[in-house]
Amino acid sequence: MDQPEKPTSRREFIKQATGAFAGMALANTLAQATVFNAHSAVYALPLGVCTTYDKAGLLKRLGYSFVEESVGKFLIPDAGDEQYAKNRLALKAEAVPVRSYIYFFPGNLKSVGPDLHHEAILQRADLALRRAKECGSQNIVFGSGGSRSIPDGFDRAKAKAQHIELCQKMAPLAEKHGVTLAVEPLNRSETNFINSLAEGVEIIQAVNNPWFKLQCDIYHMLKDDESPDEIVKYSDYITHCHIAEKRNRTAPGVEGDDFKPYFRALKKIKYQGGLSLECRWKDFDQEITRGFEVVKKQLAEV
């Protein structure tokens, strides 16, 4: 029978984990530096998948560079601090970076409307950003469409002012912890506020903090017929990207969508950040394998 492991002291854990996460940050930097040469005919990006971290080993074997996890599962899990500590141990063991996070906060924490929860949101943001830094991560995606949906009959200008006020308080937290917040425009079927890159940039310009930037989700752009030219127009703000097919949010390769117009725009602006598959899955293993091949091929063709 295996002997039980000796419990690791908090000091020992922090010492061991810090070294591991520093190594992953360096690996991230090297991958980003080598993946795209502006003078090369072949365009490539670090690819990841929005999924749970237990899939990290599989993603690594397939050629993916990172996992994109969930704030509510990885950084602030329902099971509490003990589960977060286990998540960090898994991160150290697999050594596959968690570059970014989705599901920042739930829809019942409202950023706009008559009943605000700004203080609770800021407390959650501070904890999530601190832990993201501990994990060597670069971004937290600020989508949370339910939270920012404007209630029927509520003044839109007032809602926008409320949201900007919250973001102006949140951006210094991102700066303090050294983790970028990426505002994510969502298609109109998911929320009625911040539906385009232009609308996202309005918020970013009002906040005016370099740690508060823009998420470019090609799926949402496709759903609302948003032109790839918008990527070029707002290139200075884009820090991270997502992708899925238009009709059913399937993985690239399931229905055969052509993403090359959007990839050309990313290449034109010399984008070198991450690109994550955020999809609905039927056969995860098969679809991430095919998705990697399709995205890599289409990137190389632009």
Predicted regions and their residues:
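Active-site-proximal loop/turn and secondary-structure-junction residues that shape catalytic pockets
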Residues: 51-55, 71-73, 104-107, 146-148, ...
